[in-house]
Each structure stands twice: as C-alpha cells, then as structure tokens.
Amino acid sequence: MMEIRNLAGLSPDALFAAFSEAFADYEITLDQQQYQKMLSRRGFDAALSFGAFEDGRLLSFTCNGTGIFNGQRTAYDTGTGTLKEYRGKGLASKVFEASIPYLTAAGIRQYLLEVLQHNEAAISVYRKMGFKVSREFNYFVAATDALQLKEKSLQDEYILKSLTPDDLTDPSPMWDFVPSWQNSFESIQRKPEDFRVIG
C-alpha cells in the first residue's frame, strides 16, 4: 500500500539511493558527497520534505529547503524525483499536495523552484500544479583555479583582495538583482568553505 510521509526517518544513504535512481537519466549527475553538499547549501529540511513509499521503498520524493526569500519564509524544491517505472502516475503531484498543510503549518508563505528550460516533462507537471515562470537564469560553471582571481589595486581608492564569507555583511543593499535561491547569501552562509570570496 502506498503511503506519503515526510523524509525525517529516512537515512542519507536511502535518500541518495532513491535520488540516484530517479535521476539516472538526468544530464547532471552527483556523487553522494556532492548530493549532501547540495542539500546542505539549499537548506534541506527532512521534516518538511515528503515522499511516496510502497513497502518501505521510496518511489517519488520532493526534498524541500527552507529559508527566507524576498523577505518571506519560503520552501524551495531542492529536488523532485520519481523512479522511472513510476513516472506518469501523478505521484509527484500527490507528494506535493500532501506536503502543503505541513508547509503552511510551519509558516511557509511561498514555494519556489527552478527547472531546466528543456525539461518539458517537469515544466508540464509544475504548470499543472499552478506554478508560473517568474524569471529565467543562465548558468555558468568554472573551477576556481581556472579563474583569474588575483588581488590587485583598481584605483587608488579600491583594492580587490581575498575575503572569507565571515567578512561579509548582508550585501543585499548593493544588489541590482536578487540572486537565485542556490546563490543567495543565506545559501553561501550555509557552506562558506565551498566558496572563494574576492571583494
């Protein structure tokens, strides 16, 4: 019998196994250490994340992160997946719908997610659940050792130098845009050791 419940009692190994199986045909792959870092940076909250289980096996899941976004308590979809043989049965929608009362009771006021633009199946599911596109991002990745991040003087008044995330205060007053959840200041503060800061 199918049961939808939170992921609080699920081991990290079992969650990663389900994630790996659900995303086996996805273009981006993560090992378990990368997956755990991703969950940590995105504010993963197992008690507010949910899955559909059958005979103890996780078939479909939504891992939610929580935090503040645009001044409101927010849940962020850090990853929704369904095992291949269970896709097309509406499980992702059922898991999401079952989570709403718990998210609301936890003070969540908005729900945010990001999806690759060419992932038409996911976009279709999210649109059916009432989501709308609010903005689009370009995504670039480079190893820090490939970047030319040298300390230097720009003018007499300005010097670029290495900082630690602890040296930073809230940078939002200087922003001319709001970063994505994954690149928010709160996300950086969750895993500061993963960043090199120049300022």
Where are these regions (language model features)?
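Amide-forming acyltransferase catalytic core, primarily the GNAT-like/NAT-type
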Residues: 27, 32, 128-199
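A short, polar/charged loop-to-alpha-helix boundary motif
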Residues: 68-74
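A short, internal acetyl-CoA/4′-phosphopantetheine-binding micro-motif in the GNAT/acyltransferase core
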Residues: 79-87
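A conserved short alpha-helix in the GNAT/GCN5 acetyltransferase fold that borders
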Residues: 87, 96-104
